[in-house]
Amino acid sequence: MARHGDTRSPSPVGSTYSSSRRNRRDDDRYERSRRDDGRSYRRSRSPERRYRERERDRDRDAFRRRDRSLDRRDEDSYRPGRRERSRDRRRSRERDDYRRRSRDRDYRSRREDSRDRARRRTDDSADLKYKSRRDDSRDRAKDAPRSRETSKPSTPAATAAPTEDEKRAERLAKLEAWKQKQAAEKERKQREAAAAGGARSILEEIDRKSGLSPAVSSPQSPATPGVDATPGTYTGKFDPKAIAKSASSTPAPPAVLGNDVAVPPSVKPVTTIPSQVKPKSTTSASATLKAKGNVGGFGLGTKQAADTEKSTATKTLGFGEEESTRRKLERLPTPPLEDAKDVNGTADGAADEDEDDVDMQDGGTEEEAAAAARAAAERREERLQSEAIKAQSNGAESNDTVMGDAPSQEAADNMEVDAQEEEEIDPLDAFMSELAESAPPKKKVGAKFSRTKEQQPEALFGDEHDIDMTAVGDGDADDFLAIANKAKKKKDIPAVDHKKVEYETFRKKFYTEPSDLAQMSDEEAASLRLELDGIKVRGVDVPKPVQKWSQCGLGVQTLDVIDKLGYEKTTSIQAQAIPAIMSGRDVIGVAKTGSGKTIAFLIPMFRHIKDQRPLDNMEGPVGLIMTPTRELATQIHKDCKPFLKALNLRAVCAYGGAPIKDQIADLKRGAEIIVCTPGRMIDLLAANAGRVTNLRRVTYVVLDEADRMFDMGFEPQVMKIMANIRPDRQTVLFSATFPRNMEALARKTLTKPIEIVVGGKSVVAPEITQIVEVRNDDQKFVRLLELLGNLYSSDENEDARALIFVDRQEAADALLRELMRKGYPCMSIHGGKDQIDRDSTIEDFKAGIFPVLIATSVAARGLDVKQLKLVVNYDAPNHLEDYVHRAGRTGRAGNTGTAVTFLTEDQERYSVDIAKALKQSGQKVPEPVQKLVDAFLEKVKAGKEKASASGFGGKGLERLDQERDAARMRERRTYKTGEEGEDEEEKEEKNEQAEERFNKAISSVQSTAAPSLPGVPKGIDLDGKITVHKTEKDPNSTSKNPLDKVGSAVADIHARLSRAGVMRSGVPIDNRGPDAGAFHATLEINDFPQKARWAVTNRTNVAKILEATGTSITTKGSFYPTGKVPGPGENPKLYILVEGETELAVTNAMRELMRLLKEGTIAAADSDARAPVGGRYNVV
């Protein structure tokens, strides 16, 4: 029946609802006419009728409230409507109701009865009244665990059938025999325990301290003669662990010894717990079998006292309370597995008996459980007696006091811990409860549950805890190191041994020379190349240039896309490069800006990819295109898209600044082409231990703007990627500029390349009008406004664009603010902005949303903007290649454009490259610019200036490697580790001699008036000759007494020995005076930059020099600002005094100090030059 307090909470862990669901459902379906018929199957001792009527009234009241809100509030009910309808049908006693079931009826019986059962269990826990057959069939499976948990003594029903009386008499006879046997065994064990009196006293003392009684009485056996025991009312709660054991489908969890049978603690008459009195601590039957021996059973190692009869108290340990369970470290006594089988089998069998046998159902189930428990107790007692004897013998041999199992101490037997039962103890509960226990006298190492030796819980959990902590600590240390090493190697791409990898064969050559080109002679081919903007080729077996798209050997889909894009004829670079690439050759293509280089390498790539098999799952790309800038990568990817759809190919654009997760997702879906920047490609190859993508399928590699890719800023990353690609790949390099030094690096990655140059290397296109003006800084902005005004004054230039280049990010933002104030809508782009802002700005500029764009050199390469008619170099480019690429943003694809460059008077260095570009493109050099060029060349001849090298000269990884190698070699020379061989020493000496000769030659050419390094004070030559002075002592100042000389020498030796190798913070490195050494030298450092002064005065560098040379280095004087001269009587300017015993030692120390000064000065100059920029890019 439904009851109050019903919830939707699942059944407790181990409850009997799960195990007896099938039986309860059967009862619901087939016994509806019986469960509410009002017949009583309970024993006459209970006030059943009054209880039953009261319960029915309450249950009916629960279903009268039909309002959903009231039910939800009062009963936590979710379906009161269904419950009421099903309740109405349930009151019907006709059997026809069962046959005329609706879907709601079945739903009610399955869904709502589960909540009714939970409510009934809550109500029945207080008085355990026997109900109708429906309630009993549902609660029958709970009887067995309840009998193990409660302290209720049970007797056979007085109204049992004659067969039941015979069974009961037989069981009573067996029980009497068993009790006599127990009494004899108890007397024997008490005699054996006489020798353990001292241990008993200790145990009793511990029990008193921990609040335990020396003996705890046990409830009377239900079969004790002469006692008419009545079933006591159960007022406790169910133990979830005991319920779980009975609900398990397999008999693995052992059952509790005795179920409803309590073993008497002694031969004396025992007291019976009356059913009317509620115990102070609600316990189970197994818990009431508690005696002090079970405390010793967990490790105190003492035998139980023989005088347990002293205490007649009925105090029990409250194992029914969850709090008590945590407070006392006790284990529930359980029988072996075979006993559990008997008990569970009895309970399950009773649940499955004939449903018509209602009268004897309850009594039969209870008595069978009791009989099975008694039989199990007999079998267990025999086994425990033999084990106790063995335990005593083992304890005598190991000098351990073993607890004896006397008949009166059956609770101690029940608390015996079996090896098979280890999993039943919760380690956390045991450890926490032990905190409240008194500490044992000593710990036992290697604690282990066994039947023969009782071990202490502290030893068990303490040892396990220590062992686990040690193991975890060691493992964690290793894990942390592994994680740290893994983080260091995060971006390392392992080198691939191509000899061990089997690559698929692929075809490179797709080009077949047309017949009309094959008939052309070499002279005709040379004249054709001359007509095509003067194509220059270098290499073996160079194909003749094509004149139309149909001669390139392309597919129909590709030709259709070319027609749709409006490419009527090939450009010069396309006419020569496409046949060369389609022939399978490596190509270096150099052509002017805006000449169609992108299409020249894309079209052969599509043909190359379509010839190979499709990509399988998790295979990498076939074509790889690397670019130096993110904007160029997005532009190439955009140029690919028209062909990708027609050819059913996929491409991924991977560059830094964008979320890598999106790029990883695109690569995992599969892509034949990847357009990337080198840094992000390395990230993708190293991501997820190389599982994101790989380069095994790559057979076609393109390096766009190749001269920048092989500059020091990119060359290490590019070479790392190229080393992981198969050696027989086809590699194509394209750029508008290609210095000679970059060309030498690029040829290392190519195999017999064909070099194609259209119009010359590093040449501005002739369609571009170049204007170079020399102006002061305050005049440049006014001139810029004039240029923009002239551009947009005519209507034909209404849609024109203007691109303004500056050298620094701060300058770009400042110029943006000024132009916005003047009314020009503009935007800025530089490396300091987020990538999404850079992309959106480029797109808006191309779309004409704003006509003016201010940019650093990140927008100088590859940017293709239609209607771009004006390029202004607001800050002059610092080398030729940058100027060519900046000017090449206009005048593209045959259109005309204008490039204006501003120079200032102090930018003589940059004027040389600009004048060279003007001459190569056939334009006249203005007079002011030529004056700047001549003035700079005169300074170079005089040694006042150094001619700048062509190219970017970025600071890549090679510089870091070189610095590390130099530092390692210095340490080897300093500390003489012995790792270097004689050959290395000879090489080092030769290199040093060569450097000295080179330095002497340079110093003889350089002018002493103008130092070669910025920041070096005048009059100081760091590469000049080092002057060492010999310290002269006044002969009159020394004592003529020989003893004084000996004493001073000894003191000096002791001082040096005690000071050698000692470095303490706050103490000067060496404070010897000018007379400490025979030689000394000075080096003034007052006017050097702060970084240079720090390099020669910090303790780390000075300590290295001291160890290497054995000299004394002292900083003297005072620091004076630049231009201030110390007056008479003041300290001299800051200088370093180096003293040593030999001239060579002082010279070596001075040379090392001067080297540090030189490096510090160079570093200061570099930082000053880079400080205003604040971005990643120097000039791109």
UniProtKB/Swiss-Prot annotation:
Residues 783-933 form the Helicase C-terminal domain. It is an enzyme of class 3 (hydrolase). One of its GO terms (molecular function) is RNA helicase activity. Belongs to the DEAD box helicase family. DDX46/PRP5 subfamily. InterPro entries: DEAD/DEAH_box_helicase_dom, Helicase_ATP-bd, Helicase_C-like, P-loop_NTPase, PRP5/DDX46/KHDC4_KH, RNA-helicase_DEAD-box_CS, RNA_helicase_DEAD_Q_motif. The Q motif is unique to and characteristic of the DEAD box family of RNA helicases and controls ATP binding and hydrolysis. It is found in: Nucleus. The keyword ATP-binding applies. The keyword Membrane does not apply. One of its GO terms (cellular component) is nucleus. Residues 24-151, 164-192, 376-385, 956-979 have a biased composition (Basic and acidic residues). This is Pre-mRNA-processing ATP-dependent RNA helicase prp5. It holds the Pfam family Helicase_C. Residues 1-421, 947-996 are annotated as: Disordered.
